[in-house]
Amino acid sequence: MFPVFPCTLLAPPFPVLGLDSRGVGGLMNSFPPPQGHAQNPLQVGAELQSRFFASQGCAQSPFQAAPAPPPTPQAPAAEPLQVDLLPVLAAAQESAAAAAAAAAAAAAVVTAPPAPAAASTVDTAALKQPPAPPPPPPAVSAPAAEAAPPAAAATIAAAAATAVVAPTSTVAVAPVASVLEKKTKSKGPYICALCAKEFKNGYNLRRHEAIHTGAKAGRVPSGAMKMPTMVPLSLLSVPQLSGASGGGGEAGAGGGTTAVAAGGVVTTTASGKRIRKNHACEMCGKAFRDVYHLNRHKLSHSDEKPYQCPVCQQRFKRKDRMSYHVRSHDGAVHKPYNCSHCGKSFSRPDHLNSHVRQVHSTERPFKCEKCEAAFATKDRLRAHTVRHEEKVPCHVCGKMLSSAYISDHMKVHSQGPHHVCELCNKGTGEVCPMAAAAAAAAAAAAAVVAAPPTAVGSLSGAEGVPVSSQPLPSQPW
């Protein structure tokens, strides 16, 4: 079966091709071979065939097959990981779209203008009253918030934001009140029993009391018994000294000295400043504001002079005075104040005046009330007055002391580091409560015994027995 050609030539091939008696050679001669193909007969034949069909009106040779269509490109196979993530990505896009829609709805609710109110028939006076605060939004529990979908969570967040920015929200004033309370807080009930000064805590109070007592301020143990502050009895009977001229001399120039009931001596200076002196000397009765000045003063009653000048071998009781004296050899101390009687020089005018009164002056304004002795200074009179007081022997060491200072001296024996109380059998550096109670009972009994006979007869103890016939309690020591 022959194929159908697009040409109209249905004759045998040779006459159609123009093959006569000349044969194929004549056909080849009618079409000259192309240039460059003389060496390849197959290509020459194909070229001649294509030229022949082109001259006959055919697009291509009927012997050539139709070209195959180009291959259709195939989509690459999806990877397994992307296939698995497709549902997740789709769900995320849906949730994001839902959240955006919920936020837009909440914003529309917040920014929506209020609906026009209907005509009210209420009295206009009632409208002037302030509106009641709106009820608080319902609280959402934590489990419910966790279980809510993303869209519901966005709605809850938008509602919370609307409640926060509501115009009827109130401002808390509790922190401001607490700050004002802190600023106006009082110092507290920590008051010194000696000078009535207030402190904000117990530590500052104990540190302040150490100035009066001379003890180191330390932390009080929580289980320790707190004893009241005890004032030495000697401070209650410091003699009020005055000269014949009504308290002249030092007291008149620099102020006055007053004994107070709470214990101690209050000295008023010329500038009006009050200085409380709670530490008295056992030898002369002079009072000082702290233990340091008291101990330094006690050196004046001793004959020991441990400090010696390396230049002139002069000895001193105090190191500061020796150092001051050494400076005079080097010319470092300027002494412009000279004594007109002996030519001695002084660096301060008060030192010169004191020297003139004590050495060269014949005036003795400070006179003793119990004898005819007179003194140039108040300190000399105070040291002399102690001699007239009744001496009381110490039952521990036998030392004769004034009755006004025997209580201070007993502290050396009763509050020493090696003291053991005979009542409680404990070694302590503080006053034993049992010993203090026994001493108070003994003092009360001694006062009753020393009372007049008429008063003793009117008193009666238990069961009608006179007090004077009752046995006295034993001494605590």
Curated annotation (Swiss-Prot):
GO terms for molecular function: chromatin binding; DNA-binding transcription factor activity, RNA polymerase II-specific; RNA polymerase II cis-regulatory region sequence-specific DNA binding; zinc ion binding. One of its GO terms (biological process) is positive regulation of transcription by RNA polymerase II. It comes from the Eukaryota. Keywords: Activator, DNA-binding, Metal-binding, Nucleus, Phosphoprotein, Repeat, Transcription, Transcription regulation, Zinc, Zinc-finger. One of its GO terms (cellular component) is nucleus. It holds the Pfam family zf-C2H2. The keyword Isomerase does not apply. Coiled coil: none annotated. This is Myc-associated zinc finger protein. It comes from Mus musculus (Mouse).
